[in-house]
Amino acid sequence: IGMEGTYANDIQAALKLVNQYRWEACSNGYPNPVNGKKLTKNDYVPMEWSAGLEYLARIRAAESSQTIAHERTNGSNCFQIQTPGGYSSGGECLAWWSWDLDMTTGVELWYNEKDAYLNQTGGVTGHYTSMISPSNRYVGMGAFGTSTAQYYSTSCAEFSGTNNSETFQF
């Protein structure tokens, strides 16, 4: 979509934080989001960066800065977006905030769901569980800042259990 804005590029810091939270979940035996069994240190696999998922996440961060929802600006489902090679994601996390633009803030906001997940409070937990789930092996993120939105900063993470071999120049 055409709009004025800026993308954050702190990829390594965001990926490191996601992997830190994954390690914490595995080393502390938190419930596996897939089957409810306790995670173990052997379940820990570092999340890898996917350029294809980053491609999707950058578009979705800009789109969702306007929609404030898991839907595209044309009203279609967020999972209908595909890379030029036809790949899509298996899960999407979004976050909005009104302070400085960076990728790690979104990761920290999703991490804040941990207590609701561990204590089964009924609160939102899907963003946190997407980060720690062993079935998600690849991630791409985009963080977009624009003064034309309700919140200045929007972060999007796209997750998948499989990678694609596409490369992109951002």
Predicted regions and their residues:
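A well-ordered secondary-structure block
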Residues: 77-169
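Short, well-ordered surface patches within globular domains
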Residues: 1-85, 128, 134-139
